[in-house]
């Protein structure tokens, strides 16, 4: 994968406001900034691949968790990978499955999304950042998180599964997307600082493990691996995470790009992006995970 900046916007003080670039993958070029069409189960809902392309989409994102459960990464590999399986000749991204850990765990049954709004956050006590045990214990969790990985029960049939950073990378290699993501823990926007920090450090250890196993795979020559910046709504944690991911990503190695992961309040999204953009290496691409509403495109 090769990324080149074609144009940069700067203000009178020399601060970077935005940029346009070209991301070259084995299946074509992505012109950035780009909206990534979501094809959760290897298909964009209600559209054929030809229609998706005719609308100007250059890249589609498929969901690792859902494809792992149905029809299975090995089966997709037997078809020749995602591109042949979904009849899409352009670039494909797959996420790590980290958001599904969140949706089956901290958010399960609580109507809290990874990008919260003020209505969600009003569920917190007045101090705003204390963990509200009644709120978090009000619904069951289908997930158990440990240092090694995550155990969870399928939302389809209740069967027990276990995913580690190494297994997430293996699944994504079998799927064969052009851009894949390191395994991470996506926390709730309503978690307190203590847990956000604990999860952040775990995500960093998982990132290192994801990168190490990726380097051993033959596919690492053709698949780009992005590390994910976490840290919730905390500036210090966001910047710490960006610094850590950058430290694993020298210009000629390490992560090929970065995802900016949830969670944060929608009202804080622009600020959170600015925090990490000040730290992440300029020469590598970034992807803002978990957005998609029209107003999100005009931060």
What are these regions (language model features)?
Residues 1-217:
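Non-catalytic, usually N-terminal nucleic-acid engagement modules in DNA/RNA processing proteins
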Residues 201, 213, 223-299:
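Glycine-rich phosphate/ribose-binding loops and adjacent secondary-structure elements
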């Amino acid at each position: 994968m090769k990324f080149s900046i074609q144009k940069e916007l700067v203000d009178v003080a020399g601060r970077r406001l935005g940029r346009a670039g070209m991301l070259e993958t084995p299946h074509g070029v992505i012109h950035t900034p780009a909206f990534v069409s979501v094809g959760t189960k290897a298909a964009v809902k209600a559209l054929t691949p030809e229609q998706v392309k005719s609308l100007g989409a250059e890249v589609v994102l498929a969901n690792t968790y859902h494809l792992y459960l149905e029809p299975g990464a090995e089966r997709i590999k037997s078809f020749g990978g995602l591109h042949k399986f979904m009849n899409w000749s352009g670039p494909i991204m797959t996420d790590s499955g980290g958001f599904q850990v969140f949706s089956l765990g901290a958010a399960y049954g609580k109507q809290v999304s990874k990008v919260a709004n003020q209505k969600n956050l009003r569920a917190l006590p007045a101090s705003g950042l204390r963990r509200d045990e009644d709120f978090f214990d009000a619904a069951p969790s289908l997930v158990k998180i440990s240092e090694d990985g995550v155990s969870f029960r399928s939302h389809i049939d209740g069967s027990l599964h276990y995913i580690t950073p190494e297994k997430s990378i293996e699944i994504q290699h079998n799927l064969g997307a052009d851009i894949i993501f390191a395994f991470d823990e996506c926390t709730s926007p309503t978690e307190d600082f203590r847990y956000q920090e604990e999860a952040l450090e775990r995500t960093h250890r998982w990132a290192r493990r994801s990168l190490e196993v990726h380097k051993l795979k033959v596919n690492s020559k053709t698949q780009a691996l992005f590390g994910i910046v976490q840290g919730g709504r905390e500036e210090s944690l966001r910047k710490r995470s960006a610094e850590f991911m950058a430290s694993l990503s020298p210009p000629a190695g390490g992560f090929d790009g970065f995802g900016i992961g949830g969670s944060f309040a929608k009202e804080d999204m622009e600020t959170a992006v600015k925090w990490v953009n000040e730290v992440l290496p300029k020469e590598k691409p970034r992807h803002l995970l978990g957005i998609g509403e029209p107003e999100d495109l005009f931060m």
